[in-house]
Amino acid sequence: MSREQTLKLYLADLKKDYDYILIDCMPSLGMLTINALAAADSVIVPVQAHYLPLKGMTQLMKTIGKVQRQLNPNLKIDGVLLTLADMRTKLAKTTEDSLRENYGKHIRIFKTVIPVAITAAESSAAGQSIYEYDKNGTVAKAYAE
């Protein structure tokens, strides 16, 4: 067993009990992310509406391609989701435009944009989902879309 397949082997026993298994990874390309990509059927790529996360998309796409070639040929990219976006700012609008221009022909860019809101950080700090913490807020409504 290779270390990149550890999570896939563990989840194989659980798959029969669930319709979906969500694997939420930190924004890094370490071993946990590689394991998640190797185990996943598909991936939704969240991208913060900032310059550096947008630049990181290039490396992530290369990593996903490598995982598809070497570990998980069935891995699909379901789409890219813009997060932490304050669409009143030029930066957020430019980030969205760049995503659509550079990746939109090959990868679905979701129309839904997750807005920046303090309630998202507060819900994490409280150990609650955004639906438990602020079910009628803008972030919860955006994720529900």
Tell me what each language-model feature is:
Residues S123-E145:
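C-terminal boundary of histidine-terminating zinc-finger modules
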Residues S2, S28, S42, S98, ...:
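Generic serine detector
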Residues M1-L7:
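Short glycine-rich substrate-engagement loop in P-loop NTPases that contacts/grips substrate
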Residues L9-I118:
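Conserved catalytic-core segment of NTP-binding enzymes
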Residues T6, Q59, A142-E145:
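Charged catalytic carboxylate motif
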Residues S2, K55, T138:
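Residue-level signal for the nucleotide or nucleotide-sugar donor/cofactor binding architecture
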